[in-house]
């Protein structure tokens, strides 16, 4: 069946679901089990939504899932309603990101009301990702990652909470909210130190915290590096710590060439990502007579 055939079938199912809802409101249905007609309508709306999905009519699919969700709420089937709102959100993601967020927020309300905080956290991440990629609103993405981290922490899912917090730290630093980023990197770095599995990544978090300190003030960065070396001796031997010391020295001497050379040398072994490049360029700009490029 081609898309137009699926679309037509979906429209027919919608009409059937609407008839069921109308019939459930009649006087006789009220006496003889109107709720079973509503249940049938829920099912038919969901079938229509899936048919719209097959026809790639994402908005219509989202609307049909929303209709099913509203009816589930009428029947006090909270879990089913939340599931339909999530399905609606996923359909709207492809057509109307703001509407996707609205549907996911409805689902989150239901899940938090039911005490299902882990699943609510997961949907806050989905909303944060829509703000990151579709709507490009970093402040709102941060807010949803923070909310997600709070819920995960409350449920003792610390590694999931830390993943969200690291997203917050990355964006906070980009927005020049350095102290906020430092607090998170230090907190996550300290907890990683105590885990045999995560120990290796602690140096990266202390490195990022040190770079944020450097963006505020060179002396801050110097003291931070000393603190991290005492706290986590393995940091001293890391390439990240050695790079920090070279950068501090270059900055102290106001030597752009040795700063660039140190970055180049590091980049030849560990490729710089976009975040590190941004931070290193910001620091480089505080050296007199800098040029725009890092390498």
From Swiss-Prot:
Gene Ontology molecular function terms on file: protein-containing complex binding; SNARE binding; syntaxin binding
InterPro entries membership: NSF_attach, TPR-like_helical_dom_sf
Regions that span the bilayer: none
GO biological process: apical protein localization; brain development; intracellular protein transport; neuron differentiation; regulation of synaptic vesicle priming; SNARE complex disassembly; synaptic transmission, glutamatergic; synaptic vesicle priming
GO cellular component, one term: glutamatergic synapse
Positions of modified residues (N-acetylmethionine): 1
Localisation: Cell membrane
Membrane association type: Peripheral membrane protein
Phosphoserine PTM positions: 26, 29, 195
One Pfam family in the UniProt entry: SNAP
Keyword vocabulary terms for this entry: Acetylation, Cell membrane, ER-Golgi transport, Membrane, Phosphoprotein, Protein transport, Transport
Function: Required for vesicular transport between the endoplasmic reticulum and the Golgi apparatus. Together with GNA12 promotes CDH5 localization to plasma membrane.
Subunit structure, interactors included: Interacts with PRKCABP, and disrupts the interaction between GRIA2 and PRKCABP, leading to the internalization of GRIA2. Found in a complex with VAMP8. Component of a SNARE-like complex that contains at least ZW10, USE1L, RINT1, STX18 and NAPA/SNAP-alpha. Interacts with VTI1A. Interacts with STX12. Interacts with GNA12 (via N-terminus); the interaction promotes CDH5 localization to plasma membrane.
Stated family: Belongs to the SNAP family.
Designated name of the protein: Alpha-soluble NSF attachment protein
Organism encoding this protein: Mus musculus
């Amino acid at each position: 069946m081609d898309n137009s055939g699926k679309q037509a079938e979906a429209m027919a199912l919608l009409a059937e679901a609407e008839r069921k809802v109308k019939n459930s409101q009649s006087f006789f249905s009220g006496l003889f089990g109107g709720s079973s007609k509503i249940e049938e309508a829920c099912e038919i709306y969901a079938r229509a939504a899936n048919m719209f999905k097959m026809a790639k009519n994402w908005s219509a699919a989202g609307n049909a899932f929303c209709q099913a969700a509203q009816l589930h709420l009428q029947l006090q089937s909270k879990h089913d309603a939340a599931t339909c709102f999530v399905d609606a959100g996923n359909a709207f993601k492809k057509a109307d990101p703001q509407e996707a967020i609205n549907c996911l927020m409805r689902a989150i309300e239901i899940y938090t009301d039911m005490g299902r905080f882990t699943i609510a956290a997961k949907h806050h991440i989905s909303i944060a990702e829509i703000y990151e990629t579709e709507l490009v609103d970093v402040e709102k993405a941060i807010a949803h990652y923070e909310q997600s981290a709070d819920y995960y922490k409350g449920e003792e899912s610390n590694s999931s909470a830390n993943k969200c917090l690291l997203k917050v730290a990355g964006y906070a630093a980009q927005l020049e909210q350095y102290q906020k980023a430092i607090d998170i990197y230090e907190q996550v770095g300290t907890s990683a130190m105590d885990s045999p599995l995560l120990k290796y990544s602690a140096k990266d978090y202390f490195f990022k915290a040190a770079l944020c300190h450097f963006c505020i003030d060179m002396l801050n960065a110097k003291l931070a590096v000393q603190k991290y070396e005492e706290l986590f001796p393995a940091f001293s031997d890391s390439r990240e710590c050695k790079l920090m010391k070279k950068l501090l020295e270059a900055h102290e001497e106001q030597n752009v060439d040795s700063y660039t050379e140190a970055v180049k040398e590091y980049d030849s072994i560990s490729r710089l990502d976009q975040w590190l490049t941004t931070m290193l360029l910001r620091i480089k700009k505080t050296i007199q007579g800098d040029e725009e490029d890092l390498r």
